[in-house]
Amino acid sequence: QHQTIYTFSECFLTILPLHLNLPLQQYLQHTLFNNLNDEMITTITTLFSHNGNMSSAAKELHIHRNTLLYRTQRYFEETSLDLKRSDDLLIAYLAAQLNKLTKYP
């Protein structure tokens, strides 16, 4: 049997959204979840994993950098979160993680 072992730092941001207080979870759900389709969740998580680097994230997503910029601009227009800013990217990432953790099949 092969078991995967994760360190605290590897899973902290994945489980953190479940430990946010209820009003903050509701804010994330009502304000940001409405704008999170599967494509946008993948975009946000990939951008986050590349520390906001648009070129390398676009390469991993197999899209043109301008397409990624268009997606981030569209997301900004819908949520006022600028994914080029690390603090806004973190908020969007936490919302994406909470969405994945609470989504029912």
PLM-predicted stretches and their roles:
Residues 1-105:
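Cytosolic nucleotide-utilizing catalytic cores of signal-transduction proteins
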